Amino acid sequence: MKLFITGIGTDVGKTIASSILVEALEADYWKPIQAGDLDNSDTNKVEKYVSNPTTKFHKNAYALQTPASPHYAAAIDGITIHLNQIKEPKTINHLVVEGAGGILVPLNTTDCVIDIIQPDYKVIVVSRHYLGSINHTLMTIEILKSRKLNVAGIIFSGDENKATESIILEKTNVLMLGRIDNEPYFDQNVIKYYADLFREKLLALSI
């Protein structure tokens, strides 16, 4: 099973969610494009959070120096991102693929993050409540569905907001996989706790 993790924007909790999914499934992890923070990349963070011995952490297709939209970060580095250079790693394990920002973040003048998503990927959307998050969540899911991509579930990150979550679930008819609370900190034990909570629903996606 291949899961693509996207968010409704930046800093909504994709990397924590990815860590939980990797731990729950003993999956491999791949972040095709990393923009900035190369000394403490998302791959480094997930590797720190995951404790199972099975997971492999695959190399970024592009590791860009500047924390910015990939198209701009690539331009600063003097390169252009090409989709044909983003090659999915081979593995016999489940694979968790983490996107960069939201689905319409540009990679170059023609392609966006959504264009990395393959037909056999199951997409999981991470949503976090803020003013405007309902609109951003509904638009994200609507665009994914318009591309005939498989939206397998939604994860809510942060404090619960029942009014926000209920209208999102009602309008999208997407499965809620779980919630990641605003924890004081995240470490391997906290990630494992959530992995145990999420595992059953995640495994059901592969059936």
Regions found by a protein language model. Name each.
Residues 3-21:
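Glycine-rich phosphate-binding P-loop
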Residues 16-80, 93:
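N-terminal phosphate/diphosphate-binding loop that engages ATP/GTP or pyrophosphate donors
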Residues 22, 114-117, 135-145:
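Histidine-anchored nucleotide/phosphate-binding helix
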Residues 26-28, 120-124, 145-152:
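Short, surface-exposed connector motifs at secondary-structure boundaries
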Residues 108-130:
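Inter-motif core of Ras-like GTPase G domains
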